[in-house]
């Protein structure tokens, strides 16, 4: 399978040779560490999710040996499923932190409410694959950095600049795209016509590399960063003020004016919120107003976590 290279040119912006070489080097480093399974033909099984299978109609996609899948429990005897190529939607995630997980749940909830079958594809759960090993290594690094950032000096000199400027650069996306090529094999035996919604950029990038035909990249952050680019997919954003920043790739190549994202690659969709919360908005607001008028305490529903 010949993948289209997504690292040397990003939305028409040519990367310097040294950036491209660094990206290739990054991929080689991971191959050396975790192996290259691009020729592997992993079996794929579908089974009902034990936790949100009944409530949200979610099915897990297991890749490779089920025993090496984080979501598999041999004693659960979960109901087996099949791929619904007419009404199926894959929610691709990496189980990284609360924010991404919450958004994944919201996507599954909205899909079910609209009559679709949501499939849960956690790229960080396939123990025998290079994909999961690469994601695990990057998650560990991010987690370590996050914990170290409690130190004000580390936070000021390393963590904040990396989060605000490092992740913002197109050069970062070039390396990510090369690494994401190593994640593509998990999609090999997944029907290519089923739409994929990535709630993290890696499942979206990997899906595009693997030849999935309809890929949505649900961007969680409103601060425009090249980290969140997955060329070849439709990017969605949650608020108006980030639209132009992403569209013109603002500040992603230092002071240079970049070629923009094509208009059909970016869509303002509004907030990623579970159907169960949205459907009660009017009644809930009326109840809040009633409570206020009666002098009762105000109550808030807050989700605590990243995105």
Across the structure, where does each feature detected by a protein language model lie?
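A short, glycine/small-residue-rich beta-strand->loop->alpha-helix junction that serves as a flexible
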Residues: 94-105
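Active-site donor-nucleotide binding/catalytic segment of nucleotide-sugar enzymes
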Residues: 269-271, 280-284, 288-307
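Active-site-proximal region of nucleotide-activated glycan assembly enzymes
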Residues: 210-281
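Conserved N-terminal ligand/cofactor-binding loop architecture of enzyme catalytic domains
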Residues: 4-69, 105-185
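A short, charged/proline- and glycine-enriched loop
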Residues: 79-89, 212, 293-300
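Short, surface-exposed amphipathic charged segments that create phosphate/polyanion-binding patches used
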Residues: 134-138, 231-235, 279-289
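Conserved nucleotide-sugar donor-interacting segment of glycosyltransferase catalytic cores
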Residues: 95, 127-134, 178-238, 242
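A short, basic/flexible loop-to-alpha-helix module at the beginning of a structural domain
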Residues: 70-86, 185, 225
């Amino acid at each position: 399978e010949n993948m289209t290279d997504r690292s040397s040119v990003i939305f028409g912006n040519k990367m310097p040779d040294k950036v491209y070489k660094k990206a290739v080097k990054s991929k080689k480093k991971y191959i050396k560490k975790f192996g290259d399974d691009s020729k592997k033909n992993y079996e794929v099984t579908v089974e009902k999710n034990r936790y949100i299978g009944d409530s949200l109609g979610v099915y897990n996609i297991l890749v490779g040996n089920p025993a090496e899948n984080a979501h598999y429990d041999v004693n659960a005897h979960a109901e087996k499923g099949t791929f619904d190529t007419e009404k199926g939607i894959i929610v691709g995630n990496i189980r990284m932190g609360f924010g991404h997980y919450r958004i994944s749940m919201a996507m599954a909830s909205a899909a079910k409410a609209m009559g679709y079958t949501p499939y849960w594809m956690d790229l960080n759960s396939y123990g025998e694959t290079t994909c999961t090993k690469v994601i695990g290594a990057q998650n560990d690094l991010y987690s370590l950095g996050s914990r170290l950032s409690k130190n004000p000096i580390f936070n000021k000199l390393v963590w904040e600049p990396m989060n605000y400027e490092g992740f913002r650069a197109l050069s970062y996306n070039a390396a990510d795209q090369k690494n994401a090529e190593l994640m593509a094999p998990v999609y090999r035996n997944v029907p290519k016509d089923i739409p994929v919604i990535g709630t993290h950029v890696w499942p979206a990038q990997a899906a595009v590399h693997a030849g999935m035909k309809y890929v949505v990249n649900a961007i969680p952050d409103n601060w425009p960063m090249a980290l969140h680019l997955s060329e070849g997919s439709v990017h969605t954003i949650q608020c108006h003020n980030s639209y132009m920043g992403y569209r013109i790739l603002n500040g992603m190549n230092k002071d240079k004016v970049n070629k923009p994202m094509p208009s059909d690659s970016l869509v303002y969709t509004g907030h990623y919120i579970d159907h169960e919360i949205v459907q009660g908005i009017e009644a809930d607001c009326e109840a809040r107003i009633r409570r206020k008028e009666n002098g009762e305490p105000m109550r808030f529903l807050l989700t605590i976590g990243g995105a």
